[in-house]
Structures are given as structure tokens and as C-alpha cells.
């Protein structure tokens, strides 16, 4: 596969952009190659600057659930851009998207729009602290909630990929208020709560961990968190930046039937444009400025282009049978890859929730960060490169999730399974 132009652009980028990329995992460092520079995308495919076209399972890290360049989304953005890119003032579109989110997500009675998932989680935690009058928070090893200082403690995603769970530049005084439990372990949560009585403001969790691969919650885990928080006066925050509108229209909380106090969103609700949101119970949300005393603001919050793309995307998701079709495609793909590995005699563990899935290069069940971090990352890198040569674009890290979109056809799924079968045989 020719990559001359991508490699040349990467060398140029490294002279003006730190590491040559604007988000670390894009550098392909963990798989030992230069990144692809993308020229265009359409449906479920992306094309790089060297003219190579790939079936895409990254989907811009989750937002592109209806596929790239969906005509309805493109037209919505085009019309919005013709009226002005940003006003720094309220628009009717903000109300429309807010009401769509409120109607969809069980926990959300009011919602505030922001510009990124990091901004959403950072603001939600500030609000939880203001609401409870407490300082400490609990997060989980391997769960990534953005790059805010207090959340870069034993994080997943890019931090896991590079083996840097704690970033330099985060003061110890910030990190000391972040307590870390083990995902899928209620005992570890109970111990932290017992050791820090009446000091925990919130527990923040990815209801399906998607930044250490795809790790589903075990039976009773989310229900147990809900009970602990209710008993102890702790705000339960579901970080659904990834799972929101992905694993169900109402997110993981709809799929699992557990309602948190607050929810953070991003990715899909912007239809591919920069966006985030956080919402929850009215009594909590009304503490936000200007109605309350907890401050939060943003120049581009509620950006009209992002709101328009979000409205168009959520309208598409509401079409009858959308999630049923996506579920079937995703099931077929995950089972096909599992069977391909088994027939090649290659040990992997495949996990899936809705249209999120991961092939862990491990012979052991993965249900927490300890299991995920024990995977054979060298084997994954070999698989990644082999799949890329087959025209299949996966996330360049063992610790990321793959995403299926509505644009993937049965033929795309079958082609991917056949490619995986050849790749497992090649690396076994």
C-alpha cells in the first residue's frame, strides 16, 4: 500500500504541530507506523491523500453513526452556514436540540450545550461539587473522561495507549481529590466511600467502558452504583459521550435501565462537528449560572452549525428500525471476526455492546483495566497493519473501540470478516 504522501505530510506536520497531530492517538505511535492523512470520506469509507480507500470502523472516534457526508446532515450544515457560522447569542436551534436530548435521555430534565466532551465532563463535575458541597470524586481505572486535570488519573484512551496514566503538569493538589476504583468492582467503590465519609461529590463512570477497548458492565454493577449513590448522597454521573445515542437512542441508561443523576454527551449529538452537553435533574442543573451560582460559559457553546448537524443526525436516528438494523450488522461483524480468529487458532476475546465492539488480543476475559492492559499489544499492532493493507481502517490502538455505522452494508461486513480471516492466519 502506497503511503508516500501521508508520510511526507507527517514529516511536515511534525515541524509545526507537536508530534505531528492534534490528538495523540492519531499518530499511530502504538502500532509503529506513520498515520494516514485523510483526504475525504463518504458513507462508511475514507480515502487518504495517496488515493487508498478503506472501510472505516473509526468513524471519527464515534460520531459518524449515520456515515460520513450523509446528505441530510450536509444540507443542514450548509443551510446553517449560509446564515452565519457563530453569533455568541441564543438561537432557536439550541432549544430544538435540547428538547430532543431531553426527550431521549431518561436522566436529563435540563441540558447545557458546550463544545467538547472534555468540557462536558469537567463542567458536570464542577456542578456536582457545587451541588453537594464536597470536593472528592470517584472515577474508574481505564475510564477516560477527557483531559481535564482532575480526570487524568489512571485514565484510558490515549493515556493508556502511551502508558502515561498520569500526565505531567497535573498538580498533586488536584489529583488528590480524584479517587480511583476498579471498573466492575462494587467492593472497591464501597471501600473508597467508607474510607472517605461524606466527602464524595460524585462518581463518574462510562456505563460501557470504551476507552480501554469495549468493556461492558457486569450484571448488577450499574445498579450497585446507583444504590450506593442514593444511600450516600453522591451524584452519579454517566459519561455517555461515547455511548449516548450509540448503544440505544437513550444511551446506555436506556439499554441497561439505570438512571444516573447527571449525564455527559458529545460525539453523535454534533453530527461530526465539535460539541458536548451535560444535563440531569432540574434541581441540580438550575444551580448553573446565570440561574444559580456555579459558573460555566463558552464562546462557541450552542454553535448554530453544530446544533443543525445534531438535529439532522438525531432525526435520522429516530427513523423506525434504525437501531435494530445497526444491532444486527454489529452482531454479525463481531461474531464473524470471533469465528475467523477461532478457525485460525488465534486467541482473542471479542466484546460488543450495540454498535461498539473490540477484539482483545488476550486469552482471558476482559472486564476491567487489569485485563485490558494485559493484552498483547504487539499482536494487535501486527493485526492492525495487516487489516490496513486489506483496506480495513481500525483504531490504531488496542485500547480503543470500533464503531459500526448505518452506512456499512452487508457486503462491507462480509468483506471485513474475510479480511480478518486472512489477517489472523497471517499473524498466527
From Swiss-Prot:
One of its GO terms (molecular function) is pyridoxal phosphate binding. The modification N6-(pyridoxal phosphate)lysine is found at residue 267. Coiled coil: none annotated. GO terms for cellular component: cytoplasm. Keywords: Cytoplasm, Isomerase, Porphyrin biosynthesis, Pyridoxal phosphate. SUPFAM superfamilies: PLP-dependent transferases (SSF53383). It comes from the Bacteria. It catalyses: (S)-4-amino-5-oxopentanoate = 5-aminolevulinate. It is found in: Cytoplasm. CDD domains: OAT_like. GO terms for biological process: protoporphyrinogen IX biosynthetic process. Pathway: Porphyrin-containing compound metabolism; protoporphyrin-IX biosynthesis; 5-aminolevulinate from L-glutamyl-tRNA(Glu): step 2/2. It holds the Pfam family Aminotran_3. Its cofactor is pyridoxal 5'-phosphate. Its EC number is 5.4.3.8. It is an enzyme of class 5 (isomerase). The keyword Isomerase applies. Homodimer. Belongs to the class-III pyridoxal-phosphate-dependent aminotransferase family. HemL subfamily. This is Glutamate-1-semialdehyde 2,1-aminomutase. It comes from Pelobacter propionicus (strain DSM 2379 / NBRC 103807 / OttBd1).
Amino acid at each position: 500500500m502506497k503511503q508516500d504522501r501521508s508520510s511526507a505530510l507527517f514529516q511536515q506536520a511534525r515541524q509545526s504541530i507537536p508530534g505531528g497531530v492534534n490528538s495523540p492517538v492519531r499518530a499511530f505511535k502504538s502500532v509503529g507506523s506513520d498515520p494516514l492523512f485523510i483526504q475525504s470520506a463518504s458513507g462508511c469509507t475514507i480515502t487518504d491523500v495517496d488515493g487508498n480507500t478503506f472501510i472505516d470502523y473509526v468513524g471519527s472516534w464515534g460520531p459518524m453513526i449515520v456515515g460520513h457526508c450523509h446528505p441530510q446532515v450536509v444540507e443542514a450544515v450548509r443551510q446553517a452556514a449560509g446564515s452565519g457560522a457563530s453569533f455568541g447569542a441564543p438561537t432557536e436551534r439550541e432549544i430544538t436540540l435540547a428538547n430532543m436530548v431531553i426527550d431521549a435521555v431518561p436522566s436529563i430534565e435540563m441540558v447545557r450545550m458546550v463544545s467538547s466532551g472534555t468540557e462536558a465532563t469537567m463542567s458536570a463535575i464542577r456542578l456536582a461539587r457545587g451541588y453537594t458541597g464536597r470536593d472528592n470524586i470517584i472515577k474508574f481505572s481505564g475510564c477516560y473522561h477527557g483531559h481535564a486535570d482532575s480526570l487524568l488519573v489512571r485514565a484510558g484512551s490515549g493515556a493508556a495507549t502511551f502508558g502515561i496514566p498520569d500526565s505531567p503538569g497535573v498538580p498533586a493538589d488536584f489529583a488528590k481529590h480524584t479517587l480511583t476504583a476498579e471498573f466492575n468492582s462494587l467492593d472497591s467503590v464501597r471501600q473508597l466511600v467508607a474510607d472517605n465519609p461524606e466527602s464524595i461529590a460524585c462518581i463518574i463512570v462510562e456505563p460501557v467502558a470504551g476507552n480501554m477497548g469495549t468493556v461492558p458492565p457486569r450484571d448488577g454493577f450499574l445498579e450497585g452504583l446507583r444504590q450506593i449513590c442514593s444511600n450516600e448522597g453522591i451524584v452519579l454521573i454517566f459519561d455517555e459521550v461515547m455511548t449516548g445515542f450509540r448503544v440505544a437512542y437513550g444511551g446506555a441508561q436506556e439499554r441497561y435501565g439505570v438512571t444516573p443523576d447527571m449525564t455527559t454527551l458529545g460525539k453523535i449529538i454534533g453530527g461530526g462537528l465539535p460539541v458536548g452537553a451535560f444535563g440531569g435533574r432540574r434541581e441540580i442543573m438550575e444551580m448553573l449560572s446565570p440561574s444559580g451560582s456555579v459558573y460555566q460559559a463558552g464562546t462557541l457553546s450552542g454553535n448554530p452549525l453544530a446544533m443543525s448537524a445534531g438535529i439532522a443526525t438525531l432525526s435520522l436516528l429516530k427513523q423506525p428500525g434504525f437501531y435494530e438494523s445497526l444491532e444486527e450488522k454489529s452482531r454479525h461483524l463481531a461474531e464473524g471476526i470471533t469465528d475467523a480468529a477461532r478457525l485460525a487458532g488465534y486467541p482473542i476475546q471479542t466484546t460488543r455492546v450495540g454498535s461498539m465492539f473490540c477484539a482483545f488480543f488476550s486469552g482471558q476475559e476482559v472486564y476491567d483495566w487489569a485485563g485490558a492492559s494485559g493484552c498483547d499489544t504487539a499482536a494487535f499492532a501486527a493485526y492492525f497493519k495487516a487489516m490496513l493493507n486489506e483496506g480495513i481502517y481500525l483504531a490504531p490502538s488496542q485500547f480503543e473501540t470500533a464503531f459500526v455505522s448505518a452506512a456499512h452494508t452487508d457486503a462491507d461486513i462480509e468483506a471485513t470478516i474475510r479480511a480478518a480471516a486472512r489477517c489472523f492466519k497471517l499473524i498466527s
